[in-house]
Amino acid sequence: MDPFLKESERWLRQAEYDLRGAEWNQQGGFHAQATFWAQQAAAKALRAFLFLNKEDVRETRSVVDLLDRAITYEEEFRGFVGSGRSLDLYYKTSRFPDAIPGGVPAEVISQKESVEAIRQAADIIAIVEKKRKDYLPESL
């Protein structure tokens, strides 16, 4: 198997686990943690897509940066830039008290935010899964 296809599959699999972790945290009332894992799931799914295009993108963890790269291959990813911006906000604010003036992430990030972040990440994973099928050789 092509090493880029194999790596794509690994990153997409981990993205799906991260999304499940986000859902589990959200159900348990850990909304800050859920938003962080949603952001991670989206970023890993986009890396999976980029591996399909023989790009090894490890220098960024930004969903928007990864979307910008993905758009160079598939214009359809442009529709997810707004979601990417929202998700990227959680990369730090979901974990570090100094990112939230006067509060801590666990007490400030709401259920509404975690539900939306999970939806956005799930949408990004779904488009990557769809595009991945288009890229896979018939023999797989």
Task: Locate the predicted segments by residue.
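Terminal alpha-helical segments
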Residues: 1-140
